[in-house]
């Protein structure tokens, strides 16, 4: 059995365990202003990654969900791969009680099952599957922000993401894809800039030379 088959076999053998973790984190309230719940999700994901052999770091924020950083195989020589995601949801407090995690007709429902706790659980188990298959080619880093839904308004997470990504070969985002199981290779983004301009104030039709 080759390494790819071993990895898929691991996933098949741990399917119920994956769903259990998915259920557990969905039932943790982690809406945009629920720092306690977001930090609880971070702690649980950190526990799973530590059990997989990753080194764990936490960037703590006073008024935003903490950021989780995990590294596996830092000694490997090739440029690494990043798994990127966020642990907060866009859903108000109380949703986990009102609309708890449920599987109905082969589909999973609940607050944050797609955006994006399900995606994070999937790549945590991808990492565990790679371990089980003996993968040792590239370092792997996991970067999980705690306040994406509020545009990191009260944290320095964007700066952390940029700094932690330097020198890596590729990044995979746990955001939801399309129903055809295709891979999304690009999305629109937003950047904000502050510009300072010096010169003489003038209308283009009045003294344009100056």
Where are these regions (language model features)?
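Fold-independent oxyanion-binding glycine-rich loops
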Residues: 72, 85-87, 105, 145-147, ...
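Glycine/serine-rich anion-binding loops at beta->alpha junctions
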Residues: 107-121, 203
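Acidic-enriched catalytic cores of C-N bond-cleaving enzymes acting on peptides and small amides
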Residues: 185, 205-210
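Short glycine-aspartate micro-motif
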Residues: 80-82, 108, 169-173, 192-194
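Acidic/His- and Gly-rich active-site-bordering loop/insert found
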Residues: 2-111, 131-135
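Acidic/histidine-rich catalytic neighborhood of metal-dependent amide-processing enzymes
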Residues: 116-188
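Beta-strand secondary-structure signal
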Residues: 69, 141, 192-196
